[in-house]
Design a protein with these regions (language model features):
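Sec-dependent N-terminal signal peptides
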Residues: 3-13
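Ligand-recognition surfaces built from glycine- and aromatic
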Residues: 18-21, 204-230
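Short tryptophan-centered beta-strand motifs in secreted/extracellular beta-sheet-rich domains
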Residues: 22, 109-111, 173-189
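Extracellular glycan-recognition surfaces and repeat-rich motifs
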Residues: 26-78
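Secretory/extracellular carbohydrate-interaction modules
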Residues: 58-154
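Beta-strand-rich interaction surfaces with strong enrichment in secreted/lumenal proteins
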Residues: 94-102, 164-170, 199
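Short, aromatic/His-centered strand-loop micro-motif at the edge of beta-sheets
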Residues: 155-179
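Short, solvent-exposed beta-strand-to-loop segments that form ligand-recognition rims
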Residues: 190-210
């Protein structure tokens, strides 16, 4: 049974993986298929195709993305007010929400990423279990630490959950892969196909998904794909 929705349609009615792609979007513009909530997100050309970029060079603490009210309505409809209040109160880590994925519960989320720059941080991550109050989980890689880490965000407070079993230095300005697999409360995190992170969550996953960054990171994202549990 497929366990998440796309554009209001249960994925049980659709076959195969679902990609959230900006390849056909206009370079230099804000993305449509990912809704920026915090930070500066753009569609840029890279390697002959358009990809998603977070540009942290102008990052400022407490600065949500422009047009937040309209974007919150796209994400949560009539429930958007609480989301806006919490984003404004705790805008610190850049993230963008995948358009149309109503409720991811079980399966895999994968993407390619490329860390390009960053003086304070060099991060890219997969965001999931995003709630209307702004709480979420993220699995991220940080090139400043060479590790994969699971973090939880609750009422704007970031809390460390678990670090990967080993450090994995990754070359900058090259593509790498990240995957998060959820089965019930079991979570697995992979870098370049290698299992580095295993954790049992306190409760099942349910919520929206997206991409994540930190402070002044400049990173590219591509091939964002969801595979529902069968």
């Amino acid at each position: 049974m497929r366990r998440f929705l796309l554009l209001g349609v249960a994925l049980s009615a659709l076959a195969g993986p679902i990609r959230v792609d900006v390849a056909q979007e206009k370079a230099g513009s804000e993305p449509v298929h990912f809704i920026p909530v915090v930070g500066n997100w753009l569609v840029v050309p890279e390697g002959g195709k358009n990809v998603l970029m977070v540009d942290g060079r102008q990052w400022k603490k407490g600065q949500p993305a422009g047009g937040l009210a309209d974007k919150a309505r796209l994400i949560y409809g009539s429930r958007h007010e609480e989301f806006i209040d919490n984003v404004k109160a705790f805008a610190y880590f850049p993230y963008a929400v995948a358009q149309g994925i109503e409720d991811f519960r079980e399966g895999e989320i994968s993407m390619r990423f490329q860390v390009v720059d960053g003086q304070l941080d060099q991060c890219a991550g997969i965001l999931f279990k995003l709630k209307p109050n702004g709480d979420y989980l993220t699995v991220r890689f940080n090139g400043k630490e060479d590790n994969l880490v699971l973090w939880t965000f609750n009422k704007g407070k970031r809390s460390f959950v678990k670090r990967g079993t080993e450090d994995m230095p990754l070359a900058m300005k090259q593509w790498h892969s990240m995957k998060v697999a959820i089965k019930g409360t079991k979570l697995e995190g992979y870098l370049n196909g290698k299992l580095l992170l295993e954790y049992t969550l306190p409760e099942p996953v349910s919520g929206k998904v997206g991409v994540w960054s930190k402070t002044d990171s400049v990173s590219y994202y591509d091939d964002y794909t969801l595979n529902a549990a069968q």
